[in-house]
Amino acid sequence: MQRMNLVLLLWMTVGVAVAAEPAKIIDVWPGKPPGETTDVGPEVTHPPKDGETPATIRITNIGKPTLSVFLPPKENRNGTSVIICPGGGFNILAWNKEGTEVAEWFNSIGVAAFVLKYRCPTGSRSPNWLAPAQDAQRAVSLVRSRATEFNVDPSRIGLLGFSAGGMAAGAATIKHAQRQYDASDDIDKTSCRPDFAVLVYPAYFVDKQGDLKPEFAIDKTTPPMFFAHAFNDGVTCESSVRLFLELKKAGVPSELHVYSTGGHGFGLRPSSDAASTWPKRCEEWLASRGLLK
């Protein structure tokens, strides 16, 4: 936990919105993403909310998906990488709170991180998760196709998502066998199946009755998953619970943590709630799977 606290100290002591600088930023698509025919205009970064400390950077109007690359020091790299999908209800991306801060923490444990700026807003589309999941699947293929360049193991690439980003990451993972767009180039010849997924308070996987939506059918080929959710989250923890139970039925080794308090949108910023310990539990899970060696 000491490493995480050192990484987060600056964010907890200043009230300005800052985001770590990536080593590089790469385009996810060579041209317009699938299904896009119009220009959404310039991206918009919203000012922090009044009294918000530490501040959160919120980005919207994203029509050109990118990957921001964060690489750990060479002497600490273990070959594992993770693609991070920030949350924001498919309307904004909580860019630093659920993106760049998370990337820096992963770097501190030797994991390369890629923050996905996926298309949004898509909340009014049906299904709202499709475009973000397309971007996530393409991102997996892109990182895997350039594994040598980034010094990562092509068999140790994960997807991580928060809230709506958790749905994007989860949908991309569950539907790995059916690429959610037509392949267009050599990158798309590379597998889009992540080797693991981390879903933190994932949203929208269950219907009004609390049942898992049928389009998210899990089988034995689904990658292992780690879940962290709070019992008192207004975005029901049943999404995590139902997905975990289906993984259990399919024999896919996974891990579920439901904390009594924590609410929604806690990212990995420290608090008095037990939910803020999820990064350590995630680190232990990754280590147990041999992904931090």
What are these regions (language model features)?
Residues 234-241:
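Conserved alpha/beta-hydrolase "acid-adjacent" motif
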Residues 221, 227-229:
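Short beta-strand/loop motif that positions the catalytic acidic residue
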Residues 20-77:
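N-terminal cap/lid segment of alpha/beta-hydrolase-fold proteins
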Residues 241-293:
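C-terminal catalytic histidine-bearing segment of alpha/beta-hydrolase fold enzymes
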Residues 134-220:
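Primarily recognizes the serine-hydrolase "nucleophile elbow" in alpha/beta-hydrolase
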Residues 78-87:
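Short beta-strand element of the alpha/beta-hydrolase
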Residues 93-96, 101-102, 116-151, 269-275:
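Catalytic nucleophile-loop/oxyanion-hole region of alpha/beta-hydrolase
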Residues 86-91, 231:
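Active-site glycine-rich loops that stabilize anionic/oxyanionic intermediates
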